[in-house]
A protein has these predicted regions:
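Alpha-helical substrate-recognition element adjacent to the catalytic core
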Residues: 1-118
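C-terminal cap/substrate-recognition subdomain and adjoining C-terminal extension
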Residues: 69-181
Length: 181
């Protein structure tokens, strides 16, 4: 395990692992739909990848999310192709609300290292703590984060990540090779 850990850190070549939440962090929260992407997020995430850092989207979204609320039932009416049927007796089915979210990274030229999970070698220990390993976490629920107030699809005010603040913070942390404030 120590050798695997060292190989992993060597593969980063000085880069950091950055975990990024999805709804109201990278895009407007229109769960279970994928809301519009924040353009400032695209700029910052591309800059991080360009500087050798690894991005891991982490989110409650899943490929087999239980159909458990009116929003998901409506989502399935609009997108029946997203449903996965489960064996008889195991609930009313599941829905994929992760794939479109991850594709938004790919469609915008943002390379992701992994999705919603720890390093592959950690899984061999049999211990799934569900706590993702990362050097930094970007989430609209972070303590100490500067936010901006936005209006969601229902016309309600909600907070979202301020990517200009995040960009400046990463500059101060020295995560960009050639960028200064």
């Amino acid at each position: 395990m120590i050798e695997e850990t060292q190989k992993y850190y060597d593969s980063l070549e000085g880069g950091k692992v950055i975990a990024i939440d999805f709804d109201n962090t990278v895009c407007l929260d229109e769960w279970p739909e994928v809301g519009p992407l924040f353009e400032d997020a695209v700029k910052v995430l591309k800059e991080l990848v360009k500087n050798g850092h690894k991005l891991i989207p982490y989110t409650q979204r899943s490929k087999r999310y239980p159909i458990c609320c009116p929003e998901l039932k409506q989502f399935l009416k609009d997108h029946p192709e997203k449903q996965y049927l489960t064996p008889l007796g195991f609930g009313q089915g599941r829905v994929d609300i992760l794939t479109d979210a991850i594709n938004i990274f790919k469609d915008n030229g943002i390379e992701v290292f992994d999705i919603n999970r720890n390093l592959k070698w950690e899984q061999t220990t049999g211990d799934d703590s569900r706590k993702l390993f990362a050097d930094y976490f970007i989430d609209d629920h972070n303590v100490g984060m500067q936010y901006k107030i936005i209006i969601n699809k229902n016309g309600e005010k909600c907070k979202a990540c301020d990517w200009n603040f995040i960009d400046d913070w990463f500059v101060k942390e020295g995560l960009y090779k050639n960028k200064v404030l």
